C-alpha cells in the first residue's frame, strides 16, 4: 500500500487530509510539527510527503532542506502545501527540492489528491 505522510500543524486540516487519503486507499501517517516530521519520515519511509511550511519548531523549508540531505529521504516525493503564495516562496520550495508547490487557498481537496497521484506516477 502506498504510504502518504501529512505534515500539518492545524489539527483540523490534518484530520481532513488524513480522512480523505485513507478513503482513497492510502496508508497515512502524520506529523504536527517540523521536528516530528523529520523523525517520522525516516522511521515510516513514506512514498510521498505533503508538507506545510509555517509550523512550530522547524519550518517546512528547513524540513524540506534536511529531508533532501538525508540519505533515507532524499528521493521521497514531497509536495509543499502552504498558505504562502508569493513567487519567492514558491521558488524557494522548488529550489529546495519540492516536487510540487500548492497554495492551500488555491486548490481543492480533490485537486490535492490528483496532484498526489500525478506526483507518485512521475
Segments the model singles out, each with a brief description of its role:
Residues 30-48:
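Acidic, metal-coordinating helix/loop segments flanking the phosphotransfer/catalytic sites
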Amino acid at each position: 500500500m502506498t504510504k502518504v505522510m501529512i505534515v500539518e500543524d492545524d489539527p483540523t486540516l490534518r484530520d481532513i487530509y488524513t480522512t480523505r487519503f485513507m478513503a482513497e486507499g492510502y496508508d497515512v501517517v502524520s506529523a504536527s510539527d517540523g521536528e516530528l516530521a523529520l523523525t517520522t519520515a525516516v522511521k515510516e519511509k513514506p512514498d510521498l510527503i505533503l508538507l506545510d511550511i509555517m509550523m512550530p519548531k522547524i519550518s517546512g523549508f528547513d524540513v524540506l532542506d534536511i529531508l533532501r540531505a538525508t540519505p533515507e529521504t532524499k528521493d521521497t516525493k514531497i509536495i509543499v502545501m502552504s498558505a504562502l503564495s508569493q513567487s519567492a516562496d514558491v521558488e524557494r520550495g522548488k529550489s529546495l527540492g519540492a516536487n510540487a508547490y500548492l497554495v492551500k487557498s488555491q486548490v481543492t481537496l480533490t485537486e490535492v489528491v490528483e496532484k498526489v497521484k500525478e506526483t507518485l506516477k512521475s
